[in-house]
Amino acid sequence: MIIIGEKINGSIPSVAEAIANRDAEFIKQRALAQANSGASYIDCCASVPEAEEVETLKWMIDCIQEVTDLPISVDSPSADVLTEAYKFCRKPGIFNSVSGEGDKIDKIFPLMAQPENKGWQVIALLSDDTGIPKSAEDRLKVFDKIMAKAKEYGISPDRIHIDPLVEMLCTSEDGIAMNVEVISSVRKQYPMIHITAAISNISFNLPVRKLINFGFVVLAMNAGLDSAIMDPTNRDMLGLVYATEALLGLD
């Protein structure tokens, strides 16, 4: 399982405060804790106004790289920000993210196609200009368009992490059945592709979130999930991931 550490994100109040105060030690401690807990990548999201985002991401990336040499998932909703911020990374990481929305793919995929950026990967969300499709069929249509673009630019499937966009269980009509269908279909079509998800989204606004997250991880991994945006310092969750890999013969 590819673990993308989620704990350096400006949408978290304590991280937002550290960013505002330029508290480098706080960012470094979070990066080091995730690195020591088994993260594969450290996600770095500023969640500040776009005019401040590139400079803020530079500061955050510099802090992270002072304490770990793990690759970074550079996280921004703006493709323009990503095309600048990735330059601050010392080694190839992940562009987080593109989607079927607007021209994001046409800004990021050409960068990834450049010889000097061959090691970079990307998270691709199954949404488009209409928003998040409601059915598995429509999400898979977005997926097909993304993969057509990947072929056009010469981006191999093993450099792509497809995010089927897990939504809150409390607003879902069919639990996670649709997500499982999407994950299974993507995995069957492209055995070498990566499939990721923000694990904690599923349990938002629900009691006993931990148990719901656990159940989702097992079902999603069985369907083909091999990447996760999660808290690697959560030993119970990480242990569950390793146990599920063993049970599926993936360890």
Task: Describe the residue ranges of each PLM region.
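Conserved, mostly hydrophobic/aromatic
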Residues: 34, 75, 85, 162, ...
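Catalytic beta/alpha-barrel core
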Residues: 43-50, 70-78, 93-104, 126, ...
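Active-site mouth loops of central-metabolism enzymes
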Residues: 3-29, 96-103, 129-137, 202-210
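A structural motif
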Residues: 38-39, 69, 90, 120, ...
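Catalytic alpha/beta core domains of metabolic enzymes, predominantly
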Residues: 106, 116-251
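Active-site-proximal loop/turn and secondary-structure-junction residues that shape catalytic pockets
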Residues: 8-10, 46-50, 78-80, 99-101, ...
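Glycine-rich, proline-tolerant flexible connector loops at the mouths of alpha/beta enzymes
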Residues: 35-70, 164-176
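Alpha-helix-loop-beta-strand connector modules within alpha/beta enzyme cores
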Residues: 6, 52-90, 176-197
